[in-house]
Amino acid sequence: MVTTAPHRDDREVMRDEAVMRPRILAALAEGPRTVPEIAAAIGAPAHETVFWVMAMRRYGWLAEIKGSETDGFFQYQTTGRTV
């Protein structure tokens, strides 16, 4: 179960990435979103969501939309990668 404690260890947050990936992909199925928008959609804190989004970006699950900044945040979209 994912907790929302403000001071979870970074390693603990990263272990949740595999669990959160389907929820993030489902949130982005509706269209591109920023990290705060993704966090709100999945019910997780933004400071943890940024870890998961960056990991998913690194491994080809997500891509930022170049030149589209909303309130200083890039929007992210799915890449269509499948397992």
Language-model regions, residue ranges each:
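A short acidic, leucine-rich amphipathic alpha-helix
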Residues: 37-42
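Hydrophobic residues on short alpha-helical segments
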Residues: 21-28
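Short amphipathic alpha-helical interaction segments
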Residues: 44-55
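Glycine-centered, phosphate/nucleic-acid-interacting loop/turn motifs that mediate DNA/RNA or nucleotide
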Residues: 60
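Short, cationic-aromatic polyanion-contact patches
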Residues: 5-20, 64-83
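Metal-centered catalytic cores of metalloenzymes
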Residues: 14, 25, 50-51
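Short capping segments at the starts of secondary-structure elements
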Residues: 29-34
